[in-house]
Amino acid sequence: MDTQPLIIRPRAEDVEGQPILRPLPSAKCRSVGPFVFFDHMLETVYPTGKGMNIRQHPHIGLSTLTYLFQGQIQHKDSLGSDQVVGAGDVSWMTAGSAIAHVERTPEPLWDQSFTMHGLQIWLASPKDHEQGPGHYSHHSAATLPVSDNLGVQIRMIAGSGFCLESPVPVLSPTLYAEVKMQTATTLLIPTEHEERAVYVLSGDAQLNGETIEPHALVVLPAGEEMSLFAESDVHAVVFGGAPLDGPRRINWNFVASDPVAIDEARRKWTAGEWPTVPGEVERIELPR
């Protein structure tokens, strides 16, 4: 068992012109609880006439969760969902055995300058849900539970912890919380979830007395209560959950415990044997 925090520095990526930082997956750590993929969409100002347009693409064996601090995204999928997701909302999509979706800037925002900033993560589905049906749900900011005590605000995005429980229909024990801390406040991170991590979005923080650089992901040692101290105003997320029920392979947009499922998904997407998003023609082809 690791007794020291594991520090992961993210790599910089670009998704359709949106700069991101991606600490998971990494060579040091493939997952934290059910979390197998973590993208921080950096705060980006789009000028008039510019925006995101991620064409339809497939997924299996995972749930995606989009959570924005600023901006909006329109979500459309092969189940027929069509939803504008605003700041503070949760967009939750479970892929099951096959789903396709589109993510783009809503039309009204193309006529003005706007700012995008948020997180998109993937959670691997438990083995008994990998081949299940797809599902989509939208949860407005007002439905997410919040605690505000002694200068520390916690919003439970998904799962449970800190005496809060989100309405998002997670498939395994999960912790995913947004934390805002005023200067000189402290947050105790309990041990109720076996695997936990902290990602500092902004601000100067210490974990058990050790400085955490902004944009570093810190995987916490199991079974040890940790103390997060804000040297300045801090914005962070705390996440984790129960360990995965076995290793997962990630290939492009596919996650599976069985490599055969990934091979079949690749074949079906290439052959056009995949559910499509109503009204959408353009798609992202399988990388060579």
Regions found by a protein language model. Name each.
Residues 1-288:
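Jelly-roll (double-stranded beta-helix
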